[in-house]
């Protein structure tokens, strides 16, 4: 699943190419792509048609579009947002209407500048759904996102509160980093990269880390995400692309993730791979010593 940098790359593309455009006909060709919209495909299409895209927004790994009604005296806002679930392979592409339709393009929304917003999803784990907006800690977010914490790139991210929340958890620090209700946007790749940069083993208990150590870790989370964002995100296959169909290249700079048995870029020790929460963790045994068993 895309993590914060990859989703932010898509959000920026939508903000540039889709915000301000009026939605025309919406064509839905695969029912799974709208399965989260319980009112059905016809309802989703009808409620989007004729609306102007107001903004593309994000919290953590969650992405949504807001709308208003063009021509209304107060630019009346639609009381729901289009939540975009990218899943494992979802792509939001902006294409000329005359461009060949991609094999797995399950939703196509015509825009008033002659382009189309296309949702392409090979594995069909993702989809679109309209959801009511709710006010949470001073911001309007879709109800399915209401439980998600702010992410390290959010201007209103309160690092000291997050430090306290992390240290209150009696779980492995990597598990806590992946908890989207504590801090959002971090997935397996950037958790491993941030922990390596901070010199912390992911199996250490969060409650046993000092405040300075957690502050350092959060600073590294932010730093690695900004670097990944500048590189267009991490693309391990052709399924992650931006709205123009281009892949990111941050995988070239990864220090530990996916580098089993390769030398640590800092000390030269072979990177190790371990099982963790039905996935893999990568770390340097020398730079990130395992916690001692009591």
UniProtKB/Swiss-Prot annotation:
Task: List the keywords (alphabetical).
Answer: DNA damage, DNA repair, DNA-binding, Glycosidase, Hydrolase, Lyase, Metal-binding, Multifunctional enzyme, Zinc, Zinc-finger
List ligand-binding residues for DNA: 104, 123, 169
Which residues are annotated as active site?
2 (schiff-base intermediate with dna), 3 (proton donor), 61 (proton donor), 279 (proton donor)
What EC designation does it have? 3.2.2.23, 4.2.99.18
Q: How is the cofactor bound?
A: Binds 1 zinc ion per subunit.
Q: Mind listing the GO biological process terms from this record?
A: base-excision repair
Catalyzed reactions per annotation: Hydrolysis of DNA containing ring-opened 7-methylguanine residues, releasing 2,6-diamino-4-hydroxy-5-(N-methyl)formamidopyrimidine; 2'-deoxyribonucleotide-(2'-deoxyribose 5'-phosphate)-2'-deoxyribonucleotide-DNA = a 3'-end 2'-deoxyribonucleotide-(2,3-dehydro-2,3-deoxyribose 5'-phosphate)-DNA + a 5'-end 5'-phospho-2'-deoxyribonucleoside-DNA + H(+)
GO MF term (any one): 8-oxo-7,8-dihydroguanine DNA N-glycosylase activity
Q: Where does each FPG-type zinc finger lie? A: 255-289
Which cofactor does this sequence's record say it needs?
Zn(2+)
Q: Which PANTHER family match?
A: FORMAMIDOPYRIMIDINE-DNA GLYCOSYLASE
Task: Quote the subunit structure annotation.
Answer: Monomer.
Q: Which family does it belong to?
A: Belongs to the FPG family.
What's its job? Answer: Involved in base excision repair of DNA damaged by oxidation or by mutagenic agents. Acts as a DNA glycosylase that recognizes and removes damaged bases. Has a preference for oxidized purines, such as 7,8-dihydro-8-oxoguanine (8-oxoG). Has AP (apurinic/apyrimidinic) lyase activity and introduces nicks in the DNA strand. Cleaves the DNA backbone by beta-delta elimination to generate a single-strand break at the site of the removed base with both 3'- and 5'-phosphates.
Stated name of the protein: Formamidopyrimidine-DNA glycosylase
Look up and give the organism this protein is from.
Answer: Nocardia farcinica (strain IFM 10152)
Q: What is the lineage of its organism?
A: Bacteria, Bacillati, Actinomycetota, Actinomycetes, Mycobacteriales
């Amino acid at each position: 699943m895309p993590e914060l940098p990859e989703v932010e790359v898509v959000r920026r593309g939508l903000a540039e190419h889709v915000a301000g455009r009026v939605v025309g006909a919406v064509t839905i060709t695969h029912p799974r792509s709208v399965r989260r919209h319980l009112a059905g495909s016809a309802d989703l299409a009808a409620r989007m048609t004729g609306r102007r895209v107001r903004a593309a927004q994000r919290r953590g790994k969650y992405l949504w579009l807001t709308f208003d009604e063009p021509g209304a005296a107060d630019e009346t806002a639609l009381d729901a947002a289009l939540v975009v679930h990218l899943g494992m392979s979802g792509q939001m592409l902006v294409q000329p209407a005359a461009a060949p339709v991609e094999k797995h393009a399950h939703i196509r929304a015509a825009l008033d500048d002659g382009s189309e917003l296309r949702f392409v999803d090979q594995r069909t784990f993702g989809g679109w759904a309209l959801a009511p907006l709710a006010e949470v800690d001073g911001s309007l977010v879709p109800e399915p996102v209401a439980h998600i914490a702010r992410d390290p790139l959010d201007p209103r991210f309160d690092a000291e509160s997050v430090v306290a929340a992390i240290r209150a958890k009696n779980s492995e620090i990597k598990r806590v980093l992946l908890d989207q209700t504590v801090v959002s946007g971090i997935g397996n790749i950037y958790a491993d990269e941030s922990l390596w940069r901070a010199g912390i083993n992911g199996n250490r208990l969060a409650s046993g880390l000092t405040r300075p150590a957690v502050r350092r870790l959060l600073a590294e989370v932010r730093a690695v995400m900004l670097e990944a964002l500048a590189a267009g995100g991490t693309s391990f296959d052709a399924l992650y692309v931006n709205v123009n169909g281009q892949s990111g290249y941050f995988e070239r700079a990864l220090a530990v993730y996916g580098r089993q048995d390769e030398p640590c870029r800092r000390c030269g020790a072979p990177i190790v791979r371990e099982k963790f929460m039905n996935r893999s963790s990568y770390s340097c045994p020398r730079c990130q010593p395992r916690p001692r068993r009591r």
